[in-house]
Structure formats: C-alpha cells, structure tokens
C-alpha cells in the first residue's frame, strides 16, 4: 500500500495502521510515586538509608560519590511530590504496554577500555544497581496490571502474556523485570555531566570540558540527571542556546522576527531564505564564550 494512501484507509472506516501509535506508543500517564503505590513512603525511607558508596565502583573518585549523593537527595525529594512523575506508562494501542523509569536512582559508568583511541569505551548502565529502582519498577508493573484488569480494558480483550498472572509475588515480579528489562529506551544520557568538578562534573556551564582547551560537548550526555520525559526537546534547547552564544563570539547574533538567524549588519531578503551579506559588520567585539 502506498504511504500516501494510509490516511485514506482511516477515512473509510476509522481503522488501519494510521490509527495505531507507532514506535513505542502514546503515553498513557506520567505517574508520581504516590500514584504508583500506597507504599511510597516506605520505599523512600528505605532508599534514604542506603550508603551510596556501596553502589559505586570501589575506585570511584570522591567527587563522583559527592555528586551522586547530591543527586539522590534531589531525586528522593521529588519522589515525595505528587507533581513529579517517576514512571511513564506507554501503550501502542496494540499488544504491548511499556513501563519506563524516568527518575532512576541507579548510576552506570563509562571507562577507557584500551590505549587505542579508536576502540569504544566500556559502558555499564548499572541497571537496578540501586535496589529502590527495582522496588519502584515492581510497584509500577502491579499498577499497570490493575489498569489492564479494569472493565474498559477487559472490554477490548486485554490480557497478560508477560510476565503472566501466575507471577504474583513481589520477588517473582522483580525477577521477571530483571530478565525482561532493557537499560535504555533510546534515551541514554549523562556521561559528560554539566556539574562542578567537586561533584564529578565533566563540563562547565558553558559546556567546556574541564582540563581540555577548545573542546565542548553539546548533546544529551551533559544532563546531570536523566530528564523526566523524552530527551529530544531538551537536546534541541541545549543546541539552540549553544549555537546562539557561539554566534555572539563572531558577531553573528542578529535575530529576525521570522525566526531566521542572520549575521549582524547583513541585509535579509524577507521573500527568500537566502541572506545577502555584502555589509557584514559585527556590532560588538567578539566575546569569550
């Protein structure tokens, strides 16, 4: 079937592939912890008692430990809030309901593997290295199980195939999650965190790599923590901010109402996407960004 014909199929009888959300589905809900489970206070209390040094590699620098503790303090405060989501529930309208942790407490690592700069480094997502993550994931699966058992979902024939209704204890559910979970749902972040050096940061507030002159990092790796949602819009915002600030260095900072960047002092043809730059005169001294 030609791609352009797909919308017409939906017009005829309200069915067809265009009526089914694609690639992972649409979000059903972004749930705060207290909407996931009534045991949220016990989960938070248990998490606050865990020694962070036991969760990191034995050779982790003290700055990494300090940064991790600072992040856990922030995250556990958010776990208490009725307005901060910790789980995303997505449904493709077909045969799969996905549950994603959007404020995980676990932390991974990235290490040099060899002296060959071409070889890839060693990544370890550290999935479920913080035991609270598994507690939250278990509670979230049980919440989704209750939802799929509701009358409206049963009316459309919802049934559970994995892990299966026979898997009922928290211990068994947690085991099934460990076996079936993936470490990242196409949203890896935070390998070059924008933090102070005292907290284990890699780049500063201008995204300059500490200790390396002339090198910046501009992507999702600079997020100190995973954003509580999808990453694309935040990546766009970071790139837009950096591109604008970099343009100021060379005097290219004119900004027109039609949302096109133009070199300062240039003439802009409103009827075209082309810029006429015969009179390129920077209106300020190049900065130090």
Question: Which residues are covered by each model-predicted region?
Answer:
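C-terminal structured subdomain/cap of oxidoreductase catalytic cores
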Residues: 1, 96-152, 178-289
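Mid-to-C-terminal "cap/lid" subdomains and adjacent gly/pro-rich loops that border
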Residues: 1-92, 165, 169, 179-180, ...
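Contiguous hydrophobic segments
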Residues: 7-32, 97-99, 106, 111-117, ...
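Surface-exposed beta-strand-to-loop junctions
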Residues: 8, 116-122, 155-158, 170-173, ...
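Intrinsic-disorder/low-complexity, polar/charged segments
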Residues: 130, 167-175
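Short acidic alpha-helical/loop segments enriched in Asp/Glu that coordinate divalent cations
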Residues: 151-165
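Alpha-helix boundary/capping detector
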Residues: 163, 170-171, 233
């Amino acid at each position: 079937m030609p791609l352009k014909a797909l919308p017409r199929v939906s017009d005829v009888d309200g069915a067809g592939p265009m009526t089914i959300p694609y690639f992972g589905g649409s979000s059903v809900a972004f749930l705060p912890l207290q909407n996931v489970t009534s045991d949220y206070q016990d989960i938070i209390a248990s998490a606050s008692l865990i020694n962070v040094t036991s969760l990191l590699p034995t050779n982790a620098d003290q700055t990494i430990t300090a940064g991790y503790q600072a992040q856990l303090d922030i995250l556990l405060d958010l776990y208490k809030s009725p307005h901060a989501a910790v789980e995303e529930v997505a449904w493709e309208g077909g045969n799969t309901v996905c549950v994603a942790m959007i404020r995980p407490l676990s932390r991974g690592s990235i290490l040099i593997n060899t002296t060959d700069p071409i070889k890839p480094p060693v990544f370890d997502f550290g999935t479920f290295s913080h035991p609270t993550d598994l507690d939250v994931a278990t509670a979230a699966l049980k919440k989704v199980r209750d939802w799929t058992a509701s009358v409206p979902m049963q009316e459309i024939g919802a049934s559970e195939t994995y892990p299966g209704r026979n898997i009922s204890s928290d211990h068994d559910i947690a085991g099934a999650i460990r076996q079936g979970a993936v470490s990242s749902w196409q949203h890896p972040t935070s390998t070059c965190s924008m933090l102070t050096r005292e907290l284990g940061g890699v780049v500063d507030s201008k995204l300059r790599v500490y200790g390396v002159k002339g090198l910046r990092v501009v992507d999702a790796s600079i997020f100190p923590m995973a954003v509580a949602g999808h990453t694309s819009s935040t990546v766009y915002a970071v790139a837009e901010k950096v591109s604008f600030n970099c343009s100021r260095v060379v005097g290219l900072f004119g900004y027109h109402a039609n949302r096109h960047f133009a070199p300062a002092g240039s003439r802009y043809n409103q009827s075209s996407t082309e810029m006429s730059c015969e009179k390129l005169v920077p209106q300020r001294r190049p900065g130090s960004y």
